[in-house]
Amino acid sequence: IKSSAASDVYKRQCLGMIFSLTFIGLSGCGQKKTELVNVSYDATREFYKEYNRLFEDYWYGRTGEKVEVIQSHGGSGKQALEVANGLGADVVTLALEGDVNVIRDEGLIDDGYINDYSDDSSPYTSTIVFLVRKGNPKNIKDWDDLLNDGVKVITPNPKTSGGARWNFLAAWYYFKKQGQTEEQVQASVTKLYKNVAVLDSGARGSSTTFAENGQGDVLIAWENEAFFALQEYPGEYEIVVPSASVLCQPTVAKVDEVTQMNGTEELADAYLSFLYTDDVQRLEAQNFYRPVNRDIQKEYESSSDARNIKEIPYDGKWIVSDIDMADIGYFGGWEAATQKFFSDGGIFDKIYD
């Protein structure tokens, strides 16, 4: 009897060990992924979809930790306000420094964030171009042509969209460069916005209005949005590169208060740092952003510097380098530009009243 009882105990112990090991194994299989939230702007959807998969694999290989990056996209200005008002972003990858400053001013991002990463925390750049319909029926060649009677312009709203602010500043720079006075520049830009048929809240909305809904004659667009249109609708659209534009510097930052609360500081830092690696810089170029690594950017520079682009170059060399681009310093920095042009009662409000 004692032997039988001992045998039963032994069997129960063995079964218990097997159950425990099975449970541990199943727990490992269903291990919860660490979540990282990236709040970005409209025109980055395709790029971050690819980048996030690349980063998740990289991080797992480096640490053994499974990560899931959750994306949020929308007009950059609107996205910044959402984060400032409590949307729990670990990182932001917004259209411009001024939008990140909105979050910083709420105490969620540390002062000096602009120096956390290379090139003023801008891992890729862009510029502003025009997208027109096949054959360029309104003969759009430069900013002056957007003022012509009968030309219907599509652009997003600079009160909600970071890309729209770059659009506005590019137009302002062009007319200023023509030797116009401040009053004359404002009159020219006012006339341009009188021709705006639809003012969407974000860049992707404007692209949809123009390309899918068939409204307007010309779309003022992020360079990458324009090239994606050529890729998605071959033969239907053309890019016109204006003689003057702006150097758009999308800006990235950790949301320090959130990462400290979530314990994701190291993960968030790695996520943003990885944007500067060579393979990712090439991925950015393949998504029609300009890499900040000059050697890699040169790999994608066009030799023709064509002003009218009807298709994606077969050799992948799409970057037009011969453009006069003003950076935000020309306008006194984002604090000054926001106050002058985009604040309540600023120049845009006077123009588009």
Protein language model features and the residues they cover:
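Sec-dependent N-terminal signal peptides of Gram-positive bacterial secreted proteins and lipoproteins
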Residues: 11-29
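A conserved helix-loop-strand patch within extracytoplasmic ligand-binding domains
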Residues: 104-176
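Early extracytoplasmic/lumenal segment of secretory-pathway proteins
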Residues: 29-106, 116-117, 222
